[in-house]
Design a protein with these regions (language model features):
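Conserved small/polar residues in nucleotide/adenosyl-binding loops
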Residues: 200-205
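A generic structural motif
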Residues: 4-6
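Alpha/beta-hydrolase-fold catalytic nucleophile elbow
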Residues: 170
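Conserved PDZ fold ligand-binding element
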Residues: 1
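Conserved Radical SAM active-site core
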Residues: 8-10, 17-163, 173-198
Length: 206
């Protein structure tokens, strides 16, 4: 291990341990150059709906692939640079947890208010081809990514099984703190039942 002191002097440290032993080190933070944050403006973002006055860490919209690998945080891949993909593939950072929401490009762009969000599947395919396994999540919103869009998303992800290991479908959550945000409603009971039926009757992933 290479460490650097406060005077920028580097030295090497060798740690000897058995395979099943902990490293015996604790770090002040998971990353040392700051957490990469989300610059999307999703119509369903729960952070935007949070009440004020809570602890500061709850308002951090992290979108950092390193935290995805370490802690299972979901990322969107919209802020990924070429060197980020190269680092993931080189060090085999697997699995990763990806917020998909929709595989139809125009729908994902609309939901995330990001014109680059539609490039998702090419990025997922690149990771899968490099042997990176993926867990996916869909925040399902009425009139956006339900119905045929959800069915297409399921088919697209199912086609990448077993490297795409899971697909979690989460109904949108709404609080009363939505002033000046995109209008959004909850699913009705019949609509929710239709989604469950769609997913339940779809072929199981390989």
């Amino acid at each position: 291990m290479t460490i650097e002191d406060s005077e920028c002097r580097q030295r090497q440290i060798v740690i000897e341990k058995y395979t099943d032993e902990e490293l015996g080190l604790e770090f002040e933070a998971a990353v040392f150059d700051g957490v990469t944050t989300c610059y999307n403006n999703c119509v369903f973002c729960f952070v935007d709906q949070m009440i004020p006055g809570m602890r500061e860490s709850l308002y951090v919209r992290d979108d950092d692939y390193r935290l995805s690998f370490l802690y299972g945080n979901f990322i969107t891949l919209t802020n990924m640079k070429e060197e980020d993909f190269e680092q993931i593939i080189k060090t085999h950072m697997s699995p990763l947890y990806i917020s998909v929401h929709a595989t139809r490009p125009e729908v994902r762009c609309q939901m995330m208010n990001n014109r680059f969000a539609g490039e998702l599947m090419s990025k997922i395919n690149r990771l899968v081809e490099a042997g990176i396994s993926i867990h996916t999540q869909i925040v399902c919103c009425p009139g956006y990514n339900d119905g045929e869009v959800l069915e297409q998303t399921y088919r697209d992800l199912e086609a990448l099984a077993p490297m795409v290991e899971t697909m979690a479908v989460v109904p949108v959550g709404i609080t009363k703190h939505r002033e000046h945000l995109t209008p959004m409603r909850l699913f009705s009971k019949p609509e929710a039942a239709a989604i469950v039926c769609l997913l339940y009757t779809s072929p199981s992933p390989r």
